[in-house]
Swiss-Prot record:
Gene: dapE
Name of the protein: Succinyl-diaminopimelate desuccinylase
Known EC number: 3.5.1.18
Function text: Catalyzes the hydrolysis of N-succinyl-L,L-diaminopimelic acid (SDAP), forming succinate and LL-2,6-diaminopimelate (DAP), an intermediate involved in the bacterial biosynthesis of lysine and meso-diaminopimelic acid, an essential component of bacterial cell walls.
Cytoplasm listed as a keyword: no
Entry binding sites for Zn(2+) 1: H74, D107, E171
GO molecular function, one term: cobalt ion binding
Keywords: Amino-acid biosynthesis, Cobalt, Diaminopimelate biosynthesis, Hydrolase, Lysine biosynthesis, Metal-binding, Zinc
Gene3D superfamilies, alphabetized: Zn peptidases (3.40.630.10)
Pfam families: M20_dimer, Peptidase_M20
Positions contributing to Zn(2+) 2 binding: D107, E143, H360
Length: 387
């Protein structure tokens, strides 16, 4: 019988696929081959959307009973940037000084590799079949607009009658050291553009114009300083941040007709997207009074806030982490959005993977020892889950 591949070899094979979103570049083929070889029933599903790239996705399951534990993740990666700035090839999967280098090493091909390696070892030890079901739900559409990936793959699986009891997303959840953090939720994300209308005119005749620049500055200050909430036991306060201001005016002697400012809000579970939009519109109306003409164009959002309540599943994962690392992880909801926001509608979900310090950076890398430890943690989860 051939030796079971370890996480390092799987990760290197994945890293050598330059799967910059939305390209797959063979990454799902690597997983397809390994999982079919272990007895999984594997499905490859392509989704389309007008104006977006077609995306290949993978769903694999072994076992037919309960409980059903799903591992979820993505094989697409962000661009490497200036490849000449990398000390090792961005898609070479090289190991140097005990570190595995490559775009996606941390986010999140390394985490997927550890999950696959752990499952293969676990299955080999229990005769090839779990006492329940194990599945992998892997997309190539997470780093960009995320419309043809996890959200549709979950709908497809649900239509087939798939039921999940719990899910682990292998995103890089740890801040400083492996085992320091489990993500049990995420804040939501909502973006928009504040638009202030004025009247264009010559700067020498301001009485004949209405300058939107001072007005938008007033509104930016007002909206930035208006508290949205005071946080909760599991979430920090929501925050609104302006990210750009533009008047589309290259001239120095023309008062512009319009000013625009883009912003993003990261919000906790005290708000829904609709209630938050209403709150911001209320604050805007109060700041405008009867003088300023302003409005907001909202961007579509599917990123609501969610939290998985601590309980037996988080306790089980915590125990597996403590056994391997000696650390008791913090349960928190910090960071950006992830595909866990879609999975939470189907089952309780947590995120636990590698350390995220180098994700999206030049020379993204992870210690090989962390790959080994994360594999051991995932195997510990499997042993406890199906005990």
């Amino acid at each position: 019988m051939p030796a079971t591949p370890d996480a390092l070899s799987i990760a290197r094979d994945l890293l050598r696929c330059p799967s910059v979103t939305p390209a797959d570049a063979g990454a799902l083929d690597v997983l397809d081959r390994l999982l079919r070889g272990a007895g999984f029933e594997v499905h490859r599903v392509t989704f389309s959307e007008p104006g977006a790239a077609d995306i290949d996705n993978l769903y694999a399951r072994i076992g037919t009973g309960a409980p059903h534990l799903m591992f979820a993740g993505h094989t697409d990666v962000v661009p490497p940037g200036d490849v000449s700035a990398w000390s090792h090839g961005a898609f070479a999967g090289e190991v140097a000084d005990g570190q595995l280098y490559g775009r996606g090493a941390v986010d999140m091909k390394g985490g997927i590799a550890c999950a696959v390696a752990a499952v293969l070892v676990y299955l080999a030890a229990c005769g090839g079949q779990p006492k329940g079901s194990i599945s992998f739900l892997i997309t190539g559409d997470e780093e960009d607009i995320a419309v043809n990936g996890t959200v549709k793959l979950l709908q497809w699986a649900d239509a087939r009658g798939e039921n999940f009891d719990h899910c682990i997303v292998g995103e890089p959840s740890n801040v400083e050291e492996l085992g320091d953090c489990i993500k049990i939720g995420r804040r939501g994300s909502l973006s928009g553009t504040l638009i202030v209308d004025g009247v264009q005119g010559h700067v020498a005749y301001p009485q004949r114009a209405v300058n939107p620049v001072p007005d938008i500055a007033t509104l930016i200050v007002a909206l930035s300083h208006e508290p949205l909430d005071h946080g909760t036991a599991q979430f920090q306060p929501s925050n609104l941040e302006f990210t750009s201001v533009d008047v589309g005016n290259a001239a120095t002697n023309v008062i512009p007709a319009q000013a625009r400012a883009k912003f993003n809000i990261r919000f906790n579970d005290q708000h829904s997207i609709k209630s938050l939009q209403a709150l911001i519109e209320h604050h805007l109306a109060a700041a405008c009074g009867n003088r300023i003409r302003a409005r907001i164009e909202w961007l579509p959002s599917n990123a609501g806030a969610f939290v998985t309540k601590p309980g037996p599943f988080t306790d089980l994962v915590t125990a597996a982490i403590e056994q391997v690392t000696g650390r008791r992880p913090e349960l928190n909801t910090g960071g950006g959005t992830s595909d866990a926001r879609f999975i939470t509608h189907y089952c309780p979900v947590i995120e636990f993977g590698l350390v995220g310090q180098t994700m999206h950076k030049v020379d993204e890398r992870t210690p090989v020892s962390d790959l080994e430890k994360l594999t051991a943690i995932y195997r510990g989860v499997l042993e406890r889950y199906f005990a």
